[in-house]
Curated annotation (Swiss-Prot):
Keywords: Ribonucleoprotein, Ribosomal protein, RNA-binding, rRNA-binding
GO biological process: ribosomal large subunit assembly; translation
Family of the protein in this entry: Belongs to the bacterial ribosomal protein bL20 family.
Function: Binds directly to 23S ribosomal RNA and is necessary for the in vitro assembly process of the 50S ribosomal subunit. It is not involved in the protein synthesizing functions of that subunit.
Source organism superkingdom: Bacteria
Protein biosynthesis as UniProt keyword: no
Pfam families in the cross-refs: Ribosomal_L20
Xref: PANTHER family: 39S RIBOSOMAL PROTEIN L20
Lineage, highest ranks first: Bacteria, Pseudomonadati, Pseudomonadota, Gammaproteobacteria, Alteromonadales
Keyword RNA-binding: yes
Matching PROSITE patterns: RIBOSOMAL_L20
Annotated protein name in UniProt: Large ribosomal subunit protein bL20
Species this chain originates from: Pseudoalteromonas atlantica (strain T6c / ATCC BAA-1087)
Length: 118
């Protein structure tokens, strides 16, 4: 049976991992064994946080909408319920943007929600 020399393959794999670990502190960017662990953990964090990012942004939008709605004398839940009844289909991302950048338009939406609830 022929002898298999894997020097090229191993070097390529090491090089790939060390390239991914570039910018890490200390041994994590220089020592292959430590770099593999660091890159693996970084991948796990990235996977988890891509999902958490969606939740966190929704949380932020809701907090902003709630603050703006309360400035106009209405709670968040009643505001959203009023918009649904008024058949206004604007998502929370856009509502939060309107709440921050266009107070008059948001006030009009609050009035529409109040009208639908009355």
């Amino acid at each position: 049976m022929a002898r298999v020399k894997r020097g090229v393959v191993a070097r390529a794999r090491h090089k790939k991992v060390l390239k991914q670990a570039k910018g890490y502190y200390g041994a994590r960017s220089r020592v292959y064994r430590v770099a593999v662990q660091a890159v693996t953990k970084a991948g796990q964090y990235a996977y988890r946080d891509r999902r958490q990012k969606k939740r966190q942004f929704r949380q932020l939008w809701i907090a902003r909408i709630n603050a703006a709605a309360r400035q106009n004398g209405m709670s968040y839940s009643r505001f959203i319920n009023g918009l649904k009844k008024a058949s206004v289909e604007i998502d929370r991302k856009i509502l939060a943007d309107i709440a921050v950048h266009d107070k008059n338009a948001f006030s009009a939406l609050v009035d529409a929600a109040k009208g639908a609830l009355a």
